[in-house]
Amino acid sequence: MTDFDPNQVSFAQGAVRIEGVIRKHKLDLNKIMTSRDQHVRAALKDLGVSNVPKGFGKVQLPFVFPQSQFFISHAEANGKVGEHAHHGGDALRFIAAGSVTYNGVELTEGDWMYVPKGVSYSLGIGARGATMCYCYCCCCAGFADVRDWIVDPGPEIARH
């Protein structure tokens, strides 16, 4: 066994740290943030993690999700995602490959984008396409995707 112990701090203690950093840096969780934003980069300096195995670096991100579902998506080159919002909850998008453009800023491999519940946005897809991992506090699947799995789908799902 190594000296690395990932169980030193509880989820709640980690959330308290994040709340403190949000206050210190006056981050607005009602606005979209990306890893390219200067004010976010400053906050991340206070969220570095030293409890990692040798040869690793780690930073905690400046938000907490109480529950979430994960998705991976692939987008064709030069595509567009029209203006939309996620009304069920906050979302986090990691760019795994390729690139997307949000509000004139290109996000590339390793970048991320936090999207608060209900905030509208659109994206452009880069020349190499994009592979993204999403963490949603909502589902984002369609009615047809869940219909066969729901015991009592209710009228909203049943009519689709």
Identify the residue ranges that each predicted region occupies.
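Double-stranded beta-helix
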Residues: 1-15, 122, 126-160
